[in-house]
Design a protein with these regions (language model features):
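N-terminal secretory targeting modules
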Residues: 1-78, 83-91, 159, 246-254
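Catalytic His-Asp segment of secreted/periplasmic serine-dependent ester chemistry enzymes
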Residues: 12, 24, 173-254
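Acidic/histidine-rich helix-loop elements
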Residues: 35, 39-55, 94-109, 137, ...
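Loop/turn elements at helix/coil->beta-strand transitions in domains of secreted/extracellular proteins
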Residues: 72-74, 95-97, 122-126, 161-165, ...
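Extracytoplasmic/secreted proteins, especially bacterial periplasmic and envelope-associated proteins
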Residues: 73, 77, 106, 110, ...
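Short, glycine/acidic-enriched loop or turn micro-motifs at the edges of active sites
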Residues: 83, 105, 209
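Oxyanion-hole/transition-state-stabilizing segment in secreted/luminal serine hydrolases
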Residues: 83-100, 108-147, 151, 156, ...
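Charged, glycine-enriched surface loops/patches
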Residues: 146-169, 186-202
């Protein structure tokens, strides 16, 4: 009997190692609710304790529960509100089966927590990852900790699917007014570039320099709130991804 994907995702208990630690964290079988104790999340750096995250998290998982079986073997876009807000994703890649797994407010530690149920259980054809701005802005995390968490995400994906392409997008520019100063984002992106360079089947997408102004900040005509891109921004992101998809041989859905 074929077990539905959602059932598998919600009943699977996995162990993830704390990044840089010795203890292993047993991820609860049901990750559809944000943990009451965010400090229990895997990974390094401060945990996200923004009060609104639990509601967004639960809402997104309720939506995905309805489409879990349909979302297999697609290109999974994984991230935070910037990914969640990509409403034209399917239209922008009409020849690909795209699956949006963005959660507003999420961080690298949250992605590590939900990676198996939200992504790996879907047998993805490829993964596009953009994550880290909330680690810097909401949590004041050290860029090296964020980079280590991203490295662990890449590792976890390739432990399950060793040959699928992973496209890691640089953290987009924002502003010090949003607690996301250019120097910290640039430092994080340098570390991301270094890690991607040494990871097989992993590709870097420049989503910083294509947007940043002369000060390294987000231009208001593309990021109206200095954090989230508008339609022009998503179009530029699409254009940056297309040649990478071709290089990685991420093929159109037949």
């Amino acid at each position: 009997m074929k077990i539905p994907a959602l059932f598998r995702a919600l009943t699977l208990t996995i162990g993830l190692a704390f990044v840089g630690g010795n203890a292993a964290l047993a991820i609860p079988a049901d990750i559809s609710h944000y943990p009451a104790d965010p400090d229990s999340l895997p990974g390094k750096g401060p945990a996200n304790k923004w009060g609104g995250l639990a509601g967004v998290w639960a809402q997104r998982h309720a939506e995905w529960a309805k489409t879990a079986d349909q979302d297999h073997n697609g290109v999974v876009f994984l991230g935070d509100s910037i990914t969640q807000g990509w409403k034209s994703l399917g239209q922008d890649f009409p020849n690909l089966k795209t699956v949006n797994r963005g959660i507003g407010g999420d961080t690298t530690r949250g992605v590590l927590y939900r990676l198996d149920a939200d992504v790996l259980s879907l047998d993805p054809k490829a993964v596009v990852l953009l994550i880290g701005t909330n680690d810097i802005g909401n949590n004041g995390a050290d860029p090296s900790d964020v980079a280590d968490n991203i490295k662990e995400i890449i590792k976890e994906i390739h432990q399950r699917y060793s040959h699928i392409p992973i496209v890691v997008c640089e953290v987009m520019p924002s502003t010090e007014k949003k607690q996301r100063p250019a120097d910290k984002i640039e430092e994080l992106n340098k570390l991301i570039k270094k890690d991607v360079r040494w990871s097989s089947h992993t590709y870097l997408c420049d989503t910083w320099s294509i947007f940043a102004d002369a000060n390294g900040d987000a231009p208001k005509d593309i990021f109206p709130d200095l954090l989230h891109p508008n339609a022009t921004g998503y179009a530029k992101w699409t254009a940056a991804l297309n040649p990478i998809f071709a290089k990685a041989k991420i093929q159109p859905t037949e």
